[in-house]
A protein has these predicted regions:
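Anion (oxyanion) recognition and catalysis
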Residues: 106
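Catalytic pocket-lining loop regions of alpha/beta-barrel enzymes
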Residues: 103
Length: 150
């Protein structure tokens, strides 16, 4: 498999060894995946926009920032300014507002990502799927704490 097709999640890394781990991964992967959870859409709180800035100091690889948040509008500009290359939002949080959200992401100079939970159908997002640069299909529903993998 081409390393450009591999995105590694940074959520589970050892934060005491960020620099060392990124230096090793930089040689093996094509992109980083950064989960931002707000504690509302998902019952967890994870990485922050400040960490994106730190990651960017150690790596030039693209960073896909996955907004697992109830209100992605509240985060888009902040994560773009922090250094996101791709901003991925959940279909469940943008229906009815998808075109405006994707226009804002594009205006900020980022690529547009869409995330589907296992029960979300492609049919439900067909009207704006053509606006998406990256599609992520979840194997668990992040809204269910300790959910089973589908």
């Amino acid at each position: 498999m081409n390393k450009d097709q591999i995105a590694v999640s940074l959520m589970c890394m050892d934060f005491l060894k960020i620099k060392e781990q990124l230096e090793v991964l930089n040689e093996s992967v094509g992109m980083y995946h950064i989960d931002i959870m707000d504690g509302h859409f998902c019952k967890n709180i994870t990485l922050s926009p400040d960490l994106i800035k730190s990651f960017k100091k150690v790596s030039k690889l693209p960073m896909d920032v996955h907004l697992m948040t109830t209100e992605p509008n509240d985060w888009i500009e902040t994560v773009a300014e922090a250094g996101a290359d791709i901003i991925s939002v959940h279909a469940e949080t943008i229906n009815g507002d998808a075109y405006r959200i994707y226009n804002e992401i594009e205006r900020l100079g980022c690529k547009r990502g869409l995330v589907l939970n296992p029960a979300t159908t492609l049919e439900s997002v067909k009207h704006y799927l053509n606006r998406v640069d990256l599609l992520t299909i979840m194997t668990v529903d992040c809204r269910i704490f300790r959910a089973a993998i589908y």
